Amino acid sequence: MKSIAIIGASGYTGAQITSLINADENLMIQGLYVSENSLDKGKPLSDLYPSYSHISLSLSPLCDDAKMLIVEQADAVVLATDHAVSLHLAAWFYQKGLTVFDLSGAYRFSDVEQYPKWYGFNHEYQDVLSDAVYGLAEWNSEQIASSKMIAVPGCYPTASLTALKPIGMFLTDAFPVINAVSGVTGAGRKAQLHTSFCEVSLTPYGVLGHRHQPEIATQLGQEVIFTPHLGNFKRGILATITVQLKPESTEADVAAAYAVYDDAPLITVKQNQFPKVDDVVNTPNCHLGWKFDPETHYLVVASAIDNLMKGAASQAHQCIRIHFNY
């Protein structure tokens, strides 16, 4: 049985991964941690999330003694923390010999030049960054199994890349256009005016400047036009993607490309049928639906996931299972 420490357990993603690990008979939770300055330190997790009343663990402050205890007792650490916090914590635990599963964006780019623009900091851990692998579970399982530094993908990139990677060989130079809508849990647990009950509404944000755009482009190997939207629902993502395929591409080619997921238990693919968010909420699944126009060679593919599950916590759990080979 592997022991896992969870840092940032008070947030939506941290609480979700706590629930998944708690239910996994092959894993045990070494401890749940929050910042020393957190107002939630010392509280039982169930005080914040009554639905987790079966998890009798409290949130401990991540002091220096706690960090050393993690090194002594845990096999791996899950970081559900802010990018700038994960930057340092991931490197520290990695250098102490633990396997790190980082849910932030601090290790998703291999190029250090990307970080000042997209994350607002200079990346000072090139040695750790060079060992990091991108944890897109269905595509990078061999790397996840062998690495001790796993950067779990963002929610929008997970939905988009799962849809686009199978057809990469058929893409033209035209940029895929990705329009995606996420539930408000994607904005985090802290109170914000634009996510409050009376203010939240369907609206685009981060237009031509969202940090998930270069993440998608890097992993796809092609630039994309990505426009995220905030939806007035709690959780889930629906990404609708329009791409033009090469002139010689056929409907049979597309069907054959998506057959790569035939043995992927969490991915469902349907032709001429499109997914809805309600079918994937509270599950680790991704539902894909596609339609191809043989005259224009345009393909429209829709991808639905739960942003807190397949877009974060359950994909981290997948990576843990892949890494520890069970």
UniProtKB/Swiss-Prot annotation:
- InterPro entries xref list: AGPR_AS, AGPR_type-1, NAD(P)-bd_dom_sf, NAGSA_dehydrogenase, Semialdehyde_DH_NAD-bd
EC number annotated for this UniProt entry: 1.2.1.38
What is one term from the GO cellular component aspect held by the record?
cytoplasm
Q: Which CDD domains match?
A: AGPR_1_C, AGPR_1_N
Q: Which keywords, in A-to-Z order, does the entry hold? A: Amino-acid biosynthesis, Arginine biosynthesis, Cytoplasm, NADP, Oxidoreductase
Specify the enzyme's EC class, one word: oxidoreductase
Q: Which residues form the active site?
A: C155
Signal sequence, renumbered to the chain: none
Principal localisation: cytoplasm
Molecular function GO labels: N-acetyl-gamma-glutamyl-phosphate reductase activity; NAD binding; NADP+ binding
The highest taxon in the source lineage is: Bacteria
> Could you tell me where this protein is found in the cell?
Cytoplasm
Query: Sorted alphabetically, which NCBIfam families does this protein's record hold?
Result: argC (TIGR01850)
User: Which family is annotated?
Assistant: Belongs to the NAGSA dehydrogenase family. Type 1 subfamily.
What name appears for this protein in its UniProt entry? N-acetyl-gamma-glutamyl-phosphate reductase
Give the encoding gene's name. Answer: argC
